[in-house]
UniProtKB/Swiss-Prot annotation:
Keywords, alphabetical: Acetylation, Electron transport, Membrane, Mitochondrion, Mitochondrion inner membrane, Respiratory chain, Transport
Assigned GO CC terms: mitochondrial inner membrane; mitochondrion; respiratory chain complex I
Name under which the protein is recorded: NADH dehydrogenase [ubiquinone] 1 alpha subcomplex subunit 6
Compartments, as annotated in UniProt: Mitochondrion inner membrane
Chain's role: Accessory subunit of the mitochondrial membrane respiratory chain NADH dehydrogenase (Complex I), that is believed to be not involved in catalysis. Required for proper complex I assembly. Complex I functions in the transfer of electrons from NADH to the respiratory chain. The immediate electron acceptor for the enzyme is believed to be ubiquinone.
Record-listed N-acetylalanine modification sites: 2
GO BP field: mitochondrial respiratory chain complex I assembly
Family from the record: Belongs to the complex I LYR family.
Membrane topology: Peripheral membrane protein
Length: 128
């Protein structure tokens, strides 16, 4: 009897999960596009304001890379959470709450994925 009550509660909880902002994936994608455009427009100001040693094109390429890194996500709640974090980062950058080193951390060389199988780890020199 108690198990069926727990099962019903779990089913009710899973069906009543409310979205953070977006009702569906289309609305979440719209929010992502808005954030992408805001970042894309802000790159020239950021490069000039922080006197970065990169070009505007390199900055925009990095923005594109950061957005494409999460392109596989299909849950609107997760997308909304990432959009919220992106807006916070954008606000911190615009209002110069960051220092130059904080901004330049985004421009480290892209790391190659670590090997997963034994032989690849052995050849590279990582512990198995």
């Amino acid at each position: 009897m108690a198990a069926s009550g727990l099962r019903q509660a779990a089913v009710a909880a899973s069906t009543s999960v409310k979205p953070i902002f977006s009702r569906d994936m289309n609305e979440a994608k719209r929010r992502v596009r808005e954030l992408y455009r805001a970042w894309y427009r802000e790159v020239p100001n950021t490069v000039h304001l922080f006197q970065l040693d990169i070009s505007v094109k390199q900055g925009r390429d990095k923005v594109r890379e950061m957005f494409k890194k999460n392109a596989h996500i299909t849950d609107p709640r997760v997308v909304d959470l990432l959009v919220i974090k992106g807006k916070m980062e954008l606000e911190e950058t615009i209002k110069v709450w960051k220092q130059r080193t904080h901004v330049m951390r985004f421009f480290h060389e892209t790391e190659a994925p670590r090997p997963k199988d034994f032989l690849s780890k052995f050849y590279v020199g990582h512990d198995p």
